[in-house]
Amino acid sequence: MYSDSEDESSELSTVLSMFEEKEFTRQYTVLKTLSQHGTTEVRLCSHHLTGVTVAVKALKYQRWWEPKVSEVEIMKMLSHPNIVSLLQVIETEQNIYLIMEVAQGTQLHNRVQEARCLKEDEARSIFVQLLSAIGYCHGEGVVHRDLKPDNVIVDEHGNVKIVDFGLGARFMPGQKLERLCGAFQFIPPEIFLGLPYDGPKVDIWALGVLLYYMVTGIFPFVGSTLSEISKEVLQGRYEIPYNLSKDLRSMIGLLLATNARQRPTAQDLLSHPWLQEGEKTITFHSNGDTSFPDPDIMAAMKNIGFHVQDIRESLKHRKFDETMATYNLLRAEACQDDGNYVQTKLMNPGMPPFPSVTDSGAFSLPPRRRASEPSFKVLVSSTEEHQLRQTGGTNAPFPPKKTPTMGRSQKQKRAMTAPCICLLRNTYIDTEDSSFCTSSQAEKTSSDPEKSETSTSCPLTPRGWRKWKKRIVACIQTLCCCTLPQKKCPRSVHPQK
């Protein structure tokens, strides 16, 4: 009893001390625990220089335990959009820290349980990404060997990330592996038989179990004990619901072939009819090359003390040191900013957009006019002039004007506060005699064949001209502060003499 509690306290102190080493705390701050399995723990941390959150997996460094070292080497090899990215490796005498990107989203297990089962289109989209990542791994000589719903993260947009290569292994073409590993429901027949196995064919079997689970909500081989599951797997007994499409049933049958030699490779599956129905294309390519670093990120890192040559060397040789981590974190932030750039610029609350000509809210009540202000001038912005010219809303020619921009790029348009477009006091616009026509009015007049010819150019009728003439005279009188003599009206009643 005493020894058990002593072991638990020793294990807890070991985990706590793993994240207190100076080499680690100098660069990162621990925020919270994400998961813990024995002496292996994953915590959410913050990078000091950039403030970006990362996932840190701490491993107890033991030279005799090769799988831990193998996981580090495997993560260094891989670079794929559907595989969680390794950013940095910190090695001390006692621990190994794997600094990785945070996989946003939820586990595939939770996603399936919430929906009970996924529709074929959604399952196909997820499966295509899984196949792309696994096909890439096999091309790099890496097998995962622990594919399961808990190790697949799906975000709100349906993007997939495969995590946890702790049971992964490297292999050569034709090489057989012997280590027994994996979740019971995902173990293929050859491993249950204790035979040396082909690593990629084990991943293909696991993909079949995952696909079956996504579209049905249950596992194909179930049992309360390992022996019961083993019996079902070796006999290859499972039911495929008839409500699934014929091509999907065919795909599941190929993936769950009990004979490993009959299972297709990831490359073979590319031409399967069920995958041809989807919109996503399958590629086994890696992430973008960093041989040509971004000059803006290089300049930013130089300002905080990094040397340009050190940055180039770190990226070229993939050292996974502090320099490479800082560059990749800054690049990830820049990509997110670029994705939201247009939206944030267009939705700047401090810079309201130009009001539309047909928007009644743009025409507010006119201010009180002073005697020195003319009343026959209507102000419109350059953007409104351009819109009116396109819609045929005005016939008056406007000189070309340059649109103000922000920064050096002509694509980065700067929003301007639009002037209030209003009609001044004692003036109004009549659609019958005005030269200021909106697009909706032009459409209305063009639909009438009898009036289309005259309404398109909006000519001034004699009656309208007399109105404008009186207004212009009144404005000139006000500006010049002069009055014209008025005729006295004859009185109808005269005084008697």
Curated annotation (Swiss-Prot):
The active site is at D146 (proton acceptor). The keyword Nucleotide-binding applies. Residues 28-275 form the Protein kinase domain. InterPro entries: Kinase-like_dom_sf (IPR011009), Prot_kinase_dom (IPR000719), Ser/Thr_kinase_AS (IPR008271). Residues 383-410, 439-460 are annotated as: Disordered. ATP binds at L34, S35, Q36, H37, G38, T39, T40, E41, V42, K57. The keyword Nucleotide-binding applies. GO terms for molecular function: ATP binding; protein serine kinase activity; protein serine/threonine kinase activity. It catalyses: L-seryl-[protein] + ATP = O-phospho-L-seryl-[protein] + ADP + H(+); L-threonyl-[protein] + ATP = O-phospho-L-threonyl-[protein] + ADP + H(+). Residues 292-332 form the UBA domain. It is an enzyme of class 2 (transferase). Its EC number is 2.7.11.1. It comes from the Eukaryota. Keywords: ATP-binding, Kinase, Nucleotide-binding, Serine/threonine-protein kinase, Transferase. May play a role in sperm motility, especially in the regulation of flagellar function. Belongs to the protein kinase superfamily. CAMK Ser/Thr protein kinase family. Smok subfamily. This is Sperm motility kinase Z. It comes from Mus musculus (Mouse). The lineage of its organism: Eukaryota, Metazoa, Chordata, Craniata, Vertebrata. The gene is Gm4922.
